[in-house]
Design a protein with these regions (language model features):
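Class I SAM-dependent methyltransferase SAM/SAH-binding core
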Residues: 35-87
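A short glycine-rich, Lys/Arg-flanked "PGG" loop and its adjoining helix->strand segment in the class I
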Residues: 109-124
Length: 259
């Protein structure tokens, strides 16, 4: 899977995208972790929250995208380029945070089980994954990409890696780390957006990144133009010009048993 990330486009909805991260981290009860790892740090603007929360911890950050790593470094984060599939918690990795990353990884359930099992005693694993695959924003894009007009240019279409339910992740994590405290839930955030194509702008910065990598600039602009009226019909603005965009997210926090 190729992802062509645009940090500036991704950050266009900073306030909205930050809230799930903050909600996730607020449920992590670690007091004095030795090492905190941010897997999929993106442009690094939220990694600083971890450093502020745990100022005495070593904070490590990584992302698979070289553009995101460069943006994170510009934000003062000592990020490295790495694939989350290669990560294993070390003996002092007391907190692992993965926010809006694992839905890109087909085998993410295996990763969660491995990370949970490898955490040191008392360690915490905190994960958030977008679960909006069945929403109109995604189904409209998926159907359009499967049409005769677009299937030849994007034969892989819009990938869907099957984000699970909170119960599924709770059972998986509890089995992977017997005796752990597991807290899983889901939240649908309702984002007030403005602009001519607000939902299109949102998914252009995230969901459609693999598609963007497969298209020329001209094809990408044509796809955006094809999508825009369909998305506006599904998400019409109210009388004040606000488009209300619902976005489901699934959370899981595990606290490994202590010594």
């Amino acid at each position: 899977m190729t992802l062509l990330w645009d940090p500036a486009l991704y950050r266009r909805h900073d306030d909205h995208r930050a809230r799930p991260f903050l909600d996730l981290v607020s449920r992590v009860g670690a007091i004095a972790p030795r090492e905190v790892v941010d897997l999929g740090c993106g442009p690094g603007h939220l990694t600083g929250v971890l450093a502020q929360r745990w100022p005495d911890a070593r904070v490590r950050a990584s992302d698979a995208s070289p553009d995101m790593v460069a943006a994170a470094r510009d934000n003062g984060v000592d990020a490295v380029q790495a694939d989350v599939r290669d990560f294993t918690p070390g003996p002092e990795t007391d907190v692992v945070v993965s926010n809006a990353v694992l839905h890109w990884v087909p085998e993410h359930r295996d990763l969660l089980a491995r990370w949970a099992a490898a955490l040191p005693a008392g360690g915490r694993l905190a994960v958030q994954v977008p679960g909006n695959e069945s929403s109109p924003s995604h189904t409209i894009a998926r159907d359009l990409l499967a049409s005769e007009a677009w299937a030849p240019q994007v034969p892989d279409g819009l990938a869907a890696y099957g984000v699970g339910t909170p119960e599924e992740y709770a059972r998986l994590l509890a089995a992977a780390r017997p005796g752990a405290h597991v807290d899983c839930w889901e939240t649908t955030y309702l984002h007030p957006l403005t602009g001519d194509d607000p939902v299109g702008d949102w998914i252009a910065g995230t969901t459609l990144r693999p598609v963007r990598a497969a298209l020329t600039d001209a094809e990408w602009e044509r796809l955006r133009a094809d999508l825009a009226p369909r998305l506006r019909a599904a998400y019409p603005p109210d009388d004040a010009g606000t488009t209300w965009f619902g976005f489901r997210r699934v959370f899981a926090v595990l606290a490994a048993p202590g010594d």
